[in-house]
Amino acid sequence: SKNNPEKKMFVHINSGHFEIIVVQNQKLVLFNSFDYTTPEDFLYYILFTAEQLGLNPEEFPLELIGKIDAESEYYQLAYKYIRNVSLLDVSDLQAKNNFSYTTNLF
């Protein structure tokens, strides 16, 4: 719904760094990029950001995107400390939005 007061956190994971995006009512609340080397670093930055924004780990939804799956220790650790963790299936998004990566770049 358009008027959802709930803040949602999206984390886009690459090797060595990740971005945290927080949105509320379809508006960007925060965008930040962090370097990490261990699952503990990764979790620390997520929890630190949540705390700065007054987000309760028992409540806010966390969507993980990118280089991660349910078997990953990064996912496992996040899941242990944050109640609402899910993996966002990007292929699903691409299908729904008809994103095309076959555009001719030449």
Where are these regions (language model features)?
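Hydrophobic/aromatic-enriched cytosolic interaction surfaces used to assemble or bind macromolecules
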Residues: S1-F106
